Amino acid sequence: QQQVRRQKIFLACSCLILTAGIGLFVTLHHNHQRAAAQEAELRKQIKQKQEAELQKQQELENNTIHFVAVGDNLIHQGIYESADTTQTVWNYDHLYEHIRDDISAADLAAVNEESIFVSDHANISSYPAFGSPVEIGDALVTAGFDIVEQANNHVFDKGITGITDTIRYWETSHPEVALLGIHDSAESAGEITTISCKDVTFSLLNYTTTVNNEPYDELPDYAVDLLRTDQVISDVKKAKEISDMT
């Protein structure tokens, strides 16, 4: 009887221990599942927050246009002589190497090119009447400029030939660049130059108040955009009709 009693007690204790063990296992398993679920939910929330922040930043970037404008780019003798002038083609990339990253990082970059260009190195000149090598223009494009403003007081330093040669250079060598301020015909002068960036179209206007190298007998009315109130009003009105911003 005592043996049977001890067996019953042992069996009861075993059942109790087994039940407790099962209960502990179930509790631990449940806690583990709950912790795993909480961790998964936390990771999900963090990911959603990161994605929302990334989307917000992307939307902000898509609706932000970074614009850089610099000048004057006026090429004196010491500057154009900084190239290896013993070569047939001169190189001026070094002039802009310290700003190239800033210029290239912008969505749009404009430069006021203060001097006119000449294709023949023999015609290069400095103060007071400037004529710069066309390779300066190549270096500007390499630096990342999209817009070149040519209307300024030195635009007539090489006469009408300098203006037309500069136009030909930009049109043939870098047609992707938006050229402003000078024209080779009345028809061209009547057109508004535009440029698009991130689904926004800009109208670009460029004027000069004065032109050196008087008298102006050789200078056609259409060749240079001069700052005249009536003309500016007319241009701005036309620009607003074809673009989002002027």
Question: Where are these predicted regions, by residue range?
Answer:
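Acidic, metal/ion-coordinating pockets
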Residues: 7-246
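N-terminal targeting leaders characterized by basic, low-complexity, disordered sequences
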Residues: 1-2
